Amino acid sequence: MEMTKAIVKENPRIEEIKELLEVAESREGLLTIFARCTVYYEGRAKSELGEGDRIIIIKPDGSFLIHQKKKREPVNWQPPGSKVKMEGNSLISIRRNPKETLKVDIIEAYAAVLFMAEDYEELTLTGSEAEMAELIFQNPNVIEEGFKPMFREKPIKHGIVDVLGVDREGNIVVLELKRRRADLHAVSQLKRYVDALKEEHGNKVRGILVAPSLTEGAKKLLEKLGLEFRKLEPPKKGKKKSSKQKTLDFLNDTVRITGASPPEAIQ
């Protein structure tokens, strides 16, 4: 296949998609497929997504994303390090640890694009919510004594958590950050994240809304839902050194101290 910066196939046959996948793997290309498909996931749980038009993105690092026409987050995904193969009309992404499989059965492919992307830059985060997260990582006690932040922008079932960590009792703590006055929407968003993590880890999950202030309606809803609020002003200026994120393996050490039961590892 003659290589150009981008190869576009309209109404590609399965054989052409397979060929593009092979080239993407060998040349570290970014493959995007627009198709009608069904999706099956099997791992720590099971899920099935019926027939529909979706965007399938396969990145050189193994990331595998399936987007619907709405919402920012993928409806299904696999993280970097996953391996992708094609069997018949099915794209299969396999994650080894923990063992998870995402299978996409292509019913009809409308287009496929192989993009030989060159991008060696790293994102420089500016903006007050990013700086709020940095401040929390450098000084966790602004949330509470004993809080340990572990992840920033952590993808979970229903979205992306701004900051995810644990408290001194071993509870998982979800932080939703807002640089301005928080409203009802922010509370509802936090509740969705907390509920999603409770499905996997039980009731040992807390949700904290972090903002300079909040509306009266947001305050009442927080109290009603059993969620919490911490007042925090965004830093005014200045860059700070990046804090390295750890895995949640440390939860096992926390459990030895507190005697709590460890939640399963969060993907």
Curated annotation (Swiss-Prot):
Q: Which Pfam families match?
A: NucS_C (PF01939), NucS_N (PF21003)
User: Where is this protein localized, as stated in its record?
Assistant: Cytoplasm
GO MF annotation terms = DNA binding; single-stranded DNA endodeoxyribonuclease activity
In terms of superkingdom, the source organism counts as Archaea
Cellular component terms, GO, for this chain's entry?
A: cytoplasm
Top-rank EC class of the record's enzyme: hydrolase
Query: Which keywords describe this protein according to UniProt?
Result: Cytoplasm, DNA-binding, Endonuclease, Hydrolase, Nuclease
Say where the protein is mainly found.
cytoplasm
Q: What is its EC number?
A: 3.1.-.-
The answer to whether UniProt assigns keyword Cytoplasm to this entry is: yes
Q: Does the keyword DNA-binding apply?
A: yes
According to its UniProt entry, the function of this protein is described as: Cleaves both 3' and 5' ssDNA extremities of branched DNA structures.
State the family it belongs to: Belongs to the NucS endonuclease family.
| Protein name listed in UniProt | Endonuclease NucS
- Which source organism? Pyrococcus furiosus (strain ATCC 43587 / DSM 3638 / JCM 8422 / Vc1)
Instruction: Identify the coding gene.
Output: nucS
